[in-house]
From Swiss-Prot:
It comes from Shewanella oneidensis (strain ATCC 700550 / JCM 31522 / CIP 106686 / LMG 19005 / NCIMB 14063 / MR-1). It is an enzyme of class 2 (transferase). S-adenosyl-L-methionine binds at residues 113, 133-138. The lineage of its organism: Bacteria, Pseudomonadati, Pseudomonadota, Gammaproteobacteria, Alteromonadales. CDD domains: TrmD-like (cd18080). This is tRNA (guanine-N(1)-)-methyltransferase. InterPro entries: Alpha/beta_knot_MTases, tRNA_m1G_MeTrfase_C_sf, tRNA_m1G_MeTrfase_TrmD, tRNA_m1G_MTases_N, tRNA_MeTrfase_TRMD/TRM10. One of its GO terms (biological process) is tRNA N1-guanine methylation. Specifically methylates guanosine-37 in various tRNAs. It catalyses: guanosine(37) in tRNA + S-adenosyl-L-methionine = N(1)-methylguanosine(37) in tRNA + S-adenosyl-L-homocysteine + H(+). Homodimer.
Amino acid sequence: MWLGVITLFPEMFRAVTDFGVTGRAVKNGLLELHTWNPRDFTHDRHSTVDDRPYGGGPGMLMMVQPLRDAIHAARAAAGEDAKVIYLSPQGRKLDQQGVTELAKSSRLILVCGRYEGIDERIIQTEVDEEWSVGDYVLSGGELPAMTMIDAVSRLVPGVLGKQASAEQDSFSDGLLDCPHYTRPESLDGLDVPAVLLSGNHEQIRLWRLQQSLGRTLLRRPELLQNLALTDEQSTLLAQFVEAMDKNA
């Protein structure tokens, strides 16, 4: 997957290219990330990238010309099929379904705003989609962009050691993930569930699915409202609720 990022702070993206899953993906050629800094497209001796908003008010906006030129340069490098995304609180909220949709694109250009935002005309003429990572305010679009890159890259074939790792992640099937355990078998009087030590793969699968359903019911019940549960899932969830009521 090819990724371009428009940012005033390209150094921040070393967190993506140099570390963890995404760092290995870059090293192995599965993920290609390039940055364009609007400061490199300025024409004054101060490399000015902010400007006053019309109508007054607090704060500044990103200057139009350097930002637009940076986007054009990224488009030229990416090719015509690249999708330009602006990270914005007004955008569609990112969830796993959205991540799956974005992962189908082979080329993405992410525009990271700063200050109070960017000129609306840039959004109208240069941006294909707006996306948000949540209903809160951050200082810029870099952290949301890194969040999006990390989430999307996990779905690129070969990035994770086993595709099952992505398939078992929380939200991959609309459910929260099940509990996980490692050694020791007993920790401060808390034991690993016996089924996980049994070696019975089918029983382990059923336990994990039931725990995933139950955890979703308890922590994010609204997620279940959007799912059409299979007969197996409905039975497991009913058993979970029954056991929970007995232990109440």
